Amino acid sequence: LKCKKLIPLFSKTCPEGKNLCYKMTMRLAPKVPVKRGCIDVCPKSSFLVKYECCDTDRCN
C-alpha cells in the first residue's frame, strides 16, 4: 500500500501492519491537511481535528 505524504507529490510505502492511509485536518481549515501517511487504526475525530481513513491512497 502506498499513501501520500504531506507533500502530495511524494508517496510512502506503508510498513507491514499499517494498512490504512489517513489524512488529518483541522475542522476550522478542512481543505488544509495537517498530517498524512500510513496508520494501523483510524483515530476518532474530535471537536478540533478530523481524520479521514481508507484502504487506498484516494482519500489522503
Curated annotation (Swiss-Prot):
Alphabetically ordered keywords of this record: Cardiotoxin, Cytolysis, Disulfide bond, Membrane, Secreted, Target cell membrane, Target membrane, Toxin
Record flagged with keyword Secreted: yes
GO biological process terms held by the UniProt record: killing of cells of another organism
Pfam family membership, one: Toxin_cobra-type
Tissues expressing this chain: Expressed by the venom gland.
Cellular localisation: Secreted; Target cell membrane
Cellular component GO terms, alphabetical: extracellular region; membrane; other organism cell membrane
A single MF term (Gene Ontology): toxin activity
Keyword Membrane: yes
InterPro entries in the cross-refs: Cytotoxin_Cobra (IPR003572), Snake_3FTx (IPR003571), Snake_toxin-like_sf (IPR045860), Snake_toxin_con_site (IPR018354), Toxin_cobra-type (IPR054131)
Disulphides: 3-21, 14-38, 42-53, 54-59
Listed CDD domains: TFP_snake_toxin
Function: Shows cytolytic activity on many different cells by forming pore in lipid membranes. In vivo, increases heart rate or kills the animal by cardiac arrest. In addition, it binds to heparin with high affinity, interacts with Kv channel-interacting protein 1 (KCNIP1) in a calcium-independent manner, and binds to integrin alpha-V/beta-3 (ITGAV/ITGB3) with moderate affinity.
Subunit structure: Monomer in solution; Homodimer and oligomer in the presence of negatively charged lipids forming a pore with a size ranging between 20 and 30 Angstroms.
Protein family membership: Belongs to the three-finger toxin family. Short-chain subfamily. Type IA cytotoxin sub-subfamily.
UniProt-recorded name of the protein: Cytotoxin 5
